[in-house]
């Protein structure tokens, strides 16, 4: 009889411990889900409602290559400027300007300049577009983007979220190696993303990669400016300096 009571008591304690663990897990996942949802909402509002902004991303990869991507948005024109420099000083530059009905690309590699022009209806810019019938693209980094509630909850489970004050601003620090929305390299072991709490904007990404058994880091820094892009900023390079290449 005493043994039965003892077993019953142990079982109740075990069930209580399991219930507490489950409650803690649910509370943690709920908090993460709310935070990711808030970030997604803020970035989506910026993406869909901002028609004049500048964004720059600077990369330093595990092989010490440096690259920068600048994006200029003004009205219905998007200009993308990508530059990459190797450790030995070689430089490549691509400028792509997207209009509603055409796209022009200017490449410059080792001093050779080539221009391509594509006469085609281009994708529209926007996130979470309801009743979408055309292809779309986004420009602002959104580590919390999700296509469904299920995806949001799964990412909340596999993503650690901490808060930290940096230079007087509050940040969310998102870390994961399984988040379906993070853009990993094939040898990535972990990615950490710094998100400004007030705006939802990503300001820094640190990606740890396994390079032949050695853990190295890739850094991406983000800079944003709103409502200061001019028509000169989105202008084309001098076409006369480029050789026109026919597109097949």
Q: What annotation goes with each model-predicted range?
A:
Residues 64-68, 89-95, 185-191, 202-205, ...:
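Short, surface-exposed coil-to-beta transition loops
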Residues 70-73, 96-100, 193-197, 219-229:
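Aromatic-rich beta-strand edge motifs centered on tyrosine
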Residues 58-62, 82-87, 106-111, 178, ...:
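Beta-turn initiation residues at beta-strand->coil junctions
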Residues 32-39, 106-170, 176-181:
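Flexible, processing/modification-adjacent segments and terminal tails
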Residues 2-77, 163, 232-248:
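N-terminal leader/targeting segments and the immediate start of mature chains
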Residues 2, 11-15, 154-159, 171, ...:
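Non-transmembrane domains of secretory- and envelope-associated proteins
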Residues 49-56, 75-81, 167-175, 201-204:
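Short, hydrophobic/aromatic-rich segments at coil-to-beta transitions
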Residues 70-140, 217:
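An acidic-aromatic
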């Amino acid at each position: 009889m005493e043994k039965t009571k003892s077993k019953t008591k142990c079982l109740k304690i075990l069930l209580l411990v399991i219930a507490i663990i489950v409650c803690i897990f649910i509370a943690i996942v709920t908090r993460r889900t709310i935070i990711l949802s808030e970030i997604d909402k803020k970035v989506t509002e910026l993406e869909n409602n901002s028609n004049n902004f500048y964004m720059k991303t600077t990369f330093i990869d595990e092989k010490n290559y440096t690259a920068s991507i600048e994006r200029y948005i003004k009205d219905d024109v998007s200009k993308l400027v990508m530059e990459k420099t190797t450790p030995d000083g070689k430089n490549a530059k691509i400028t792509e300007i997207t209009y509603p009905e055409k796209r022009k690309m200017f490449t410059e590699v080792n001093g050779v300049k080539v221009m391509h022009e594509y006469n085609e209806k281009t994708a529209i810019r926007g996130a979470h577009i309801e009743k979408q019938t055309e292809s779309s693209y986004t420009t602002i980094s959104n580590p919390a983007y999700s296509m469904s509630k299920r995806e949001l909850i799964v990412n909340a489970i596999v993503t650690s979220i901490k808060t930290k004050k940096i230079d007087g601003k509050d940040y969310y620090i998102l870390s994961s190696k399984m988040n379906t929305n993070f853009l990993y390299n094939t040898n990535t072991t972990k990615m950490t993303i710094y998100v400004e709490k007030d705006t939802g904007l990503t300001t820094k990404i640190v990606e740890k990669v396994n390079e032949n058994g050695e853990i190295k880091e890739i850094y991406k820094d983000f800079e944003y400016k709103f409502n200061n892009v001019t028509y000169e900023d989105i202008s084309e390079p001098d076409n006369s300096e480029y050789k026109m290449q026919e597109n097949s």
